[in-house]
Amino acid sequence: MNFEANYRDLQSKMSFKDGKNGGKKGLKNQININAVFLPFVSRNPERAKFKNGFKGVLGEFARLVLDKTWDDELSADEIVKKIISEERVDCSLENEKYLEKLIADYLFDDNNDLNILKPSLFLYLPRNENNEKKGEYEIALFIRDVFFNKKDDFEFDEKFKDFFKDFNSNHILIKLILKSIFELPEKEIPLKYDTISNGVVNLFKEDINFLLDKNETYLLNNMELIFAYYYFFYSSQCTLLIDKDFKGDFDGGIEPLYYALDWESISKNRKTIKQGFNLVYDANAYLFDKCCLLSQLNTYMGVEGKLLFELNDEFNEYGDEDKQECLKWLKKWIDDYQYVKDISTLSRNSRIDIPENVDNEFGDVVNLLSSTLYEGVDQAVRSRYSLNIREIAKLYFLKNRGVHGSILNLTQDMFLVITSLCIKEDKIKLNHLFGEYEKRGLFFDKYSKEKIVDLLNNLNLIDK
């Protein structure tokens, strides 16, 4: 392998300038280059705050799945006018205003949000009007790429496309609206994000496939909660896996995160306090640094979408000569970085644990690069990046419990939706049900389990 050429490519990708010949020295801490794992952004205005829930993401997602794009000129009034103006709608001028109001009242709620009467109307959920639309768009693209990658499961993707193409209805007004609805502009967007947690993806497909086959109405009515949960589930597991560095692997299963229930009280000894969102929070503290590290190493080693433990396997496949060349030019890159960032001393706080299966020299050089990034990344950028996962958690999965702080929490609505995905059509044995919860990332201590049993017994959902 030509590591010198890879080194030059890395310089280019990171906008490296050595400052010679009177120029200004510098480089950019770029992420999402050859290692694109999460849809997080580092600029506060662009970070999704979910003021309208997950609807903005679902609208973008539906359009991405069907290779459509939003028309920025559209508004609630424009949508109604476009429906009325279609040739299929034939009415006199005196009745036009009445029809406009009738359609508007049916299509939009009191907050002027679109009522999703049929799956095809997801396409017309508007973008956020401010810069947060970039953050929502990236999340939608991430969900499409990770969960609906047509290269991996063409049949599943086509089935979901058919779901969004449903323009049929027996209701006369809905039928009028759907027949008169206008086409959005076409735009195909290439894949961007890498998938690193196939176990979560496979569970998602299992659950969505069941609903597409057996209960599309339930999917339509609960799509916001289902997609928001799986986005948080995947993102948190992905973050925890990246944080394991060399110690990660794909065989370790789901990392346990304990939840409390919205309707129960909490004491200091509960598992969710010590093994809940605090783990995700800690892993996110230096996530930007780790994404920089992975982008640089993937680019330098001429690969894509690999985590640190996979890059170690890659290095171990090299012959002795390639290993030495790899280390030589990687050290050169670290020298470059330290030079343009004026880094003279390194903190030991950023050191990565090196297991026995990691080549000592490779581990030491990666550690040196990690420590260098620790000094070279702006703390404000690092902090803003760590807030991305907290935004979705605040909306659906966190509750302030006084002295215990914010802990992972499930509302009854969210809990019952995930329960329905676990149970499917038939009643289920209690032990099997808790196993299904844990497969989906929901872990409960004995106190929460007692509350769950009480609720499910009242709803007659489990076999005793």
How would you label these PLM feature ranges?
Residues 442-455:
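Short amphipathic alpha-helical interaction segments
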Residues 457-464:
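A short, conserved structural fragment
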Residues 324-407:
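Long, low-complexity, charged/polar intrinsically disordered regions in eukaryotic proteins
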Residues 81-257:
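Long, mid-chain structured domain cores
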Residues 409-426:
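Positively charged, polyanion-binding regions of nucleic-acid-associated proteins
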Residues 426-440:
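Short acidic, hydrophobic short linear motifs in intrinsically disordered regions
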Residues 213-347:
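Long, internal scaffold/assembly segments composed of regular secondary structure
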Residues 1-113:
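Charged, amphipathic alpha-helical stretches
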